[in-house]
């Protein structure tokens, strides 16, 4: 399968990410472009998107910094870049199980400069 790359724009910040080869990644890819207002939860940005999905078999609340995921209870696109209020160590932890569908290609810590309410857009890279 051809590598699928996206660009995440948040204010003056543009960071690329690569989607994995999962059903969730396919659903996100087919829904692009996406946009919404950033919600901040610790070192996580999330926003509602017009996509619905259930938890996949590999869904987990344990994620890695730089993971991008879909949160089924909130129909939300999530970007993890550090500790969240649910973390028990230095790793991010989602509020509940998420479907990870990709990973940030650059420095995910740059998302710390994004404020709540900032418009986020997700587009096909290029």
Q: Predicted regions span which residues?
A:
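Well-ordered alpha/beta subsegment
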Residues: 1-3, 93-126
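Extended, low-hydrophobicity, polar/charged segments
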Residues: 11, 35-37, 48-54, 61, ...
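Surface loops and adjacent helix of pleckstrin homology
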Residues: 20, 82, 125
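Compact, glycine-rich, soluble single-domain proteins
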Residues: 31, 39-65, 71
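Short, basic/aromatic beta-hairpin or loop at an interaction surface
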Residues: 36-50, 88-103
């Amino acid at each position: 399968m051809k590598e699928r790359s996206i660009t995440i724009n948040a204010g003056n910040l543009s960071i690329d990410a690569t989607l994995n080869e999962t059903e969730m990644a396919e659903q996100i890819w087919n829904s692009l472009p996406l946009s919404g207002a950033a919600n901040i939860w610790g070192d996580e940005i999330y926003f509602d998107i017009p996509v619905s999905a259930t938890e996949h078999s590999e869904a987990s609340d344990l994620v890695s910094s730089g993971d991008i995921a879909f949160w089924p209870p909130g129909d939300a696109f999530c970007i993890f870049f550090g500790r969240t209020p649910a973390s028990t160590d230095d790793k991010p932890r989602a509020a509940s199980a998420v479907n990870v569908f990709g990973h940030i290609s650059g420095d995910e810590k740059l998302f710390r400069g994004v404020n709540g309410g900032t418009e986020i857009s997700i587009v096909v890279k290029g």
